[in-house]
Amino acid sequence: MSPITREERLERRIQDLYANDPQFAAAKPATAITAAIERPGLPLPQIIETVMTGYADRPALAQRSVEFVTDAGTGHTTLRLLPHFETISYGELWDRISALADVLSTEQTVKPGDRVCLLGFNSVDYATIDMTLARLGAVAVPLQTSAAITQLQPIVAETQPTMIAASVDALADATELALSGQTATRVLVFDHHRQVDAHRAAVESARERLAGSAVVETLAEAIARGDVPRGASAGSAPGTDVSDDSLALLIYTSGSTGAPKGAMYPRRNVATFWRKRTWFEGGYEPSITLNFMPMSHVMGRQILYGTLCNGGTAYFVAKSDLSTLFEDLALVRPTELTFVPRVWDMVFDEFQSEVDRRLVDGADRVALEAQVKAEIRNDVLGGRYTSALTGSAPISDEMKAWVEELLDMHLVEGYGSTEAGMILIDGAIRRPAVLDYKLVDVPDLGYFLTDRPHPRGELLVKTDSLFPGYYQRAEVTADVFDADGFYRTGDIMAEVGPEQFVYLDRRNNVLKLSQGEFVTVSKLEAVFGDSPLVRQIYIYGNSARAYLLAVIVPTQEALDAVPVEELKARLGDSLQEVAKAAGLQSYEIPRDFIIETTPWTLENGLLTGIRKLARPQLKKHYGELLEQIYTDLAHGQADELRSLRQSGADAPVLVTVCRAAAALLGGSASDVQPDAHFTDLGGDSLSALSFTNLLHEIFDIEVPVGVIVSPANDLQALADYVEAARKPGSSRPTFASVHGASNGQVTEVHAGDLSLDKFIDAATLAEAPRLPAANTQVRTVLLTGATGFLGRYLALEWLERMDLVDGKLICLVRAKSDTEARARLDKTFDSGDPELLAHYRALAGDHLEVLAGDKGEADLGLDRQTWQRLADTVDLIVDPAALVNHVLPYSQLFGPNALGTAELLRLALTSKIKPYSYTSTIGVADQIPPSAFTEDADIRVISATRAVDDSYANGYSNSKWAGEVLLREAHDLCGLPVAVFRCDMILADTTWAGQLNVPDMFTRMILSLAATGIAPGSFYELAADGARQRAHYDGLPVEFIAEAISTLGAQSQDGFHTYHVMNPYDDGIGLDEFVDWLNESGCPIQRIADYGDWLQRFETALRALPDRQRHSSLLPLLHNYRQPERPVRGSIAPTDRFRAAVQEAKIGPDKDIPHVGAPIIVKYVSDLRLLGLL
């Protein structure tokens, strides 16, 4: 028996709804009414009347019920939402429309052809007024509530409305528009409740300001004066004899290509909104919809009137900021899900948040995700949807796939425009709405019909609802039509099959972002080009994303002033300043950018002959890297949000608020300053809602959207708000609770801060000195960080040792489940070397246990029973795990690294005393005098106080220092045996193929040298006579380091031992010798005598590499090579203890610290080839 398809499941669900859901069944479209309104030539007012009278007894519109609450202290009355909706029938709605039409026509307020501006959010009142205007033959001019008053004033001046209808919340702006426009004789106020003090005050204020120029009246007052019998026919009401070609609606664009322009909709085009099956394939089933799109957007009108023409019920969200969206969805249980991509993003965010919130120790994430999806389907979305559509902007392939999996049905993708209506459904030409189409060449962007494998060009169309032009803009209208009357969509498409298209680009450098905003990149480039730090700038966007990226070539003065790594922050600040001065919107400011130090010229092909940006070449040159940034920001955002939800409350509030804003908006935490406003960082109302939810999840504090988007509140103010509302105390230590903080800022930390009692309970500490020692014959080892480069070799080393004693290696691996943790670890050994994989599998079969956990979490992220088992059975803890990040501050690395070490210490001090092998970094030396930095010195003495700043790797080094301090404290408490291994560069081994630490600097260097085939005459400063100087490169092979850590760690059954795991020799083996060895091995590398010439050629060659190579090259770290290095002879710190211990234990093939030899360097090339990078 074949499996049931999605389509079959949908059909069964629809049948079940008809049988068991009375509301669904009662909303079925009436065939007779549908046929009546589909009659060709039926005027718009008659269509509306046919629907209203035909479905008179059905519920038409619905809004949230409210109650009025009076504050006992102030006496002020406000609204409170109730958890249910109240409806108005079609008949009642028609009575309201008729009464209002009677008043407006009788009093000559609105005549056929008059323009009426509407300012407010979609609601029962808004819909009533809008349909009344259609009945009267007037022209509706919906205004964008999100637009600034200065953007609306030109529209009012151009349309000269006789009336302005405004919600009470927008009344102040409407008053300004009425005063400046001077043509409106009436301001009609809707969504007004006379019981609410603020509403009455708003009306009184408007009446005072407009006294003598315009009448201010509420909708309720106007309808009450209407003199129309219930159920009256339209008859000969004004507007019934108006031509179908007469203007009925003006939809103003956002003005990205200049001043806002109004797309004209004649009555026949507006009528298509009421004939749902002409634009929506799901128009045959009952329509119960939740309406949240504004009426200034075509999609908002299609949803509302498509619902009514089907005899359905249109519900309205309770709040325009969509803060009640999920609550409203659950109450309404819509049959149609017509969302823009940003709302699908919100559903996905809700899913992720719920999964992260519930994910507990040992939980099966796959099963949990399936459960949460089911709950969202049934409890949030209502479980009775029969169609789903996304439109207004492109949706990413990844999001579409997730939505379809969530809904268990196909997600229809609609593509159209304000001017032409629906054009494509799922990429296919929408027939019969599209009468004709064609692609035309766009030579200036490099798109041609002769392109292979598919023709590419701008899509031009003729449709049955094509607009006649822009209001009072004849020249602009002429520009958007060709000589044959085809409308230029401005969209570049590839025709991948007969009448099947894929969107590629915007012709006029106008991008529509995923939230529906248009941005003109050429205008933005001109604005940002005014920055004194910017020489050239290329703005890049993807319509599936909500924000922009950029590539910036700084001025030479800017490059000379500060290092490149410091320049990014300055450039970011400059862009913000220029944007503020130019009055740009937040979405017009690039969220991230690449710094390019080589100017674009005619010679390198990145400028055109008239010195304009060569956009196709720039996109080809940077496009994949920029798309990777989008991907990285998205992935990083998910990881950071998960981290914030799990441990954000443990950090200082300001730090977490900044991190949360950066994570939510896709930025870098280091670039977010406390004085930044959320909207300045690219936030809007939807993302502000997500921010509200995130802060609540982190702090259990409600921060209203209004507080977040208020111009008076920067991130510091938001943090202050949280601080004021937050209950004191925390169940886990935090950076602030351990090191103290002043307004979240710490400039130095002290070893004395890191006392064990701040991390470990008193009972454990009191018992520790009396505990027995672990078994000196190590049979059970706990290893962290096993998937890391060093960690995997430690895992292999300890598996081999456990094989000799029939012991067990327990690896703690970050993953959703133990199964996924094991899979992660297995994958690290599957590098293309079958012998390695077989060796690992043979050992792992009997001696490996993998647990999903995290050293930075409470109880290591394990259930209590498992944690106690480890406390009882583990003989040795080997801890190379760390969050290695050379940019994040100590405050952000405190949790995973310092607190993580404390969590392992608590395990080490429970049940029995377990020796602890700790991998540190030689970087802890950066704040210690060289003479004091020895292997036997107490870190608490030689580095009692450390600076906390933004210098390179400051946070990472401090976090490892903190771990060493805690280990010293534990040793003093109970004699905990400790071995600390301070490592420098860890190089590849010579045994196993394909095992490389691809992201590290050294691997990038070898790949870049081999791929470009050029190297400098010397990487080091030359001697006075121009000769190469003797130099030493400090690195050791990973196999040797793993053996040393394992051997010396196992031997450390008492005492505290510190080892500098470094290459101490003044052997004249450095980077120059590595190049010699590569040449001798048959990897040709040309020497460029002048270092500057080499660097320039090297960078150019790296940028020309194929994407995968370029991404793994030295390019992102090239700033470290701007000048030749100063040669170092020998190691930077003493290694006497380490070398003596190695010699005594006979570690390694030389029974001594090894030199770096040619086989190691040459093997890098063969391994890179094996991995497909060379």
UniProtKB/Swiss-Prot annotation:
InterPro entries: ACP-like_sf (IPR036736), AMP-binding_CS (IPR020845), AMP-dep_synth/lig_dom (IPR000873), ANL_N_sf (IPR042099), CAR (IPR046407), Far_NAD-bd (IPR013120), NAD(P)-bd_dom_sf (IPR036291), PKS_PP-bd (IPR020806). GO terms for biological process: biosynthetic process. GO terms for molecular function: ATP binding; long-chain fatty acid-CoA ligase activity; NADP binding; oxidoreductase activity, acting on the aldehyde or oxo group of donors, NAD or NADP as acceptor; phosphopantetheine binding. The keyword Protein biosynthesis does not apply. It comes from the Bacteria. Its EC number is 1.2.1.-. The modification O-(pantetheine 4'-phosphoryl)serine is found at S685. Its cofactor is pantetheine 4'-phosphate. GO terms for cellular component: membrane. Displays in vitro half-lives of 73, 70, and 48 hours at 26, 30, and 37 degrees Celsius, respectively, indicating it is a relatively stable enzyme. Optimum pH is 7.5. Disulfide bonds: none annotated. Keywords: ATP-binding, Fatty acid metabolism, Lipid metabolism, NADP, Nucleotide-binding, Oxidoreductase, Phosphopantetheine, Phosphoprotein. This enzyme can be applied to the microbial production of fatty alkanes and fatty alcohols that have numerous applications as fuels, fragrances, emollients, plasticizers, thickeners, and detergents. Thus, together with complementing enzymes, the broad substrate specificity and kinetic characteristics of Car opens the road for direct and tailored enzyme-catalyzed conversion of lipids into user-ready chemical commodities. Catalyzes the ATP- and NADPH-dependent reduction of carboxylic acids to the corresponding aldehydes. Catalyzes the reduction of a wide range of aliphatic fatty acids (C6-C18) into their corresponding aldehydes. Can also reduce benzoate to benzaldehyde. Has a preference for NADPH over NADH as the electron donor. The N-terminal domain likely catalyzes substrate activation by formation of an initial acyl-AMP intermediate, the central region contains the phosphopantetheine attachment site, and the C-terminal domain catalyzes the reduction by NADPH of the intermediate thioester formed from the attack of the phosphopantetheine thiol at the carbonyl carbon of acyl-AMP. Large-scale domain motions occur between the adenylation and thiolation states. Phosphopantetheine binding alters the orientation of a key Asp, resulting in a productive orientation of the bound nicotinamide. Belongs to the ATP-dependent AMP-binding enzyme family. Carboxylic acid reductase subfamily. This is Carboxylic acid reductase.
